[in-house]
Amino acid sequence: MAQGGQVSAGGGRRDDDEPIEQTSGAGTQQVNVTGTDDLLDEIDGLLENNAEEFVRSYVQKGGQ
């Protein structure tokens, strides 16, 4: 029953999903870029204030 549902749903949705996925994918990439830019700006601000402390917080100690 699951196989039949997958075939039917997949066959009917392929044509409809392709344009939607392309549009959704472009929107997702823009959101990810915005989030990445915000994160990089935050890191830059931290590095300007105290680079040594920032680096120490990410250094692994004792092989962990």
UniProtKB/Swiss-Prot annotation:
InterPro entries: Ubiquitin-like_Pup (IPR008515). Is modified by deamidation of its C-terminal glutamine to glutamate by the deamidase Dop, a prerequisite to the subsequent pupylation process. GO terms for biological process: modification-dependent protein catabolic process; proteasomal protein catabolic process; protein pupylation. Residues 21-58 are annotated as: ARC ATPase binding. Residues 1-35 are annotated as: Disordered. Residues 21-33 have a biased composition (Polar residues). Protein modifier that is covalently attached to lysine residues of substrate proteins, thereby targeting them for proteasomal degradation. The tagging system is termed pupylation. The N-terminal unstructured half of Pup provides a signal required to initiate unfolding and degradation by the proteasome but is not needed for pupylation, while the C-terminal helical half of Pup interacts with ARC to target proteins to the proteasome. HAMAP family: Pup. This is Prokaryotic ubiquitin-like protein Pup. It comes from Corynebacterium jeikeium (strain K411). The gene is pup.
